[in-house]
């Protein structure tokens, strides 16, 4: 009973502090903002699902790296895992329309790891970033399950003159399942779709789609 009580106290404390921080991003709210409380409640209820995703990411990072001797090593020392951990939480807040906080979280991870994952990106299960430095994943990127990115991989947007930001238009690539993108490769544009089971070799530059089961060298 004591353990259960402690867990409930921790949960309530997180709920209270998160509600307060969300309220600070909403100028129209007072200290007892019901909208902020509802968002915080929805986030707390999603924690088990976030944990499940992170455990799958941890497995992908451990099983995908022969140099890793334990999951504890990956969790405590791998920059890719750290960036993914923060992304999963920030993305949940982003999906709940929380302003500013998700981006602050992603920029903190960026400053600590050199990995820039926008919280708006949609990333599937078993996500693995190897080495990590210089990886960029843009806001409207869609990534499937079991995808591995190596250092310097960029999933970015094209920047034609006068292009305006439109949240309803995908500006970044879509990547299928079981894809490997090797070091310093760049994939750009919302029309770029990478099929399942594709390998993108190092230093590639793609602005067009790739059929499934293809090796790009």
Residue spans for each PLM region:
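Short, small-residue-biased leader/transition segments that mark boundaries at the very start
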Residues: 2-9
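Amphipathic alpha-helical segments within well-ordered protein domains
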Residues: 19, 23, 90-91
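Hydrophobic alpha-helical segments and helix pairs
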Residues: 25-83
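Extended, small-residue-rich solenoid/repeat segments and analogous flexible loops
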Residues: 55, 59, 69-76, 80-135
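Left-handed beta-helix
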Residues: 113, 118-119, 124-125, 130-139, ...
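Regulatory activation segment
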Residues: 164-171
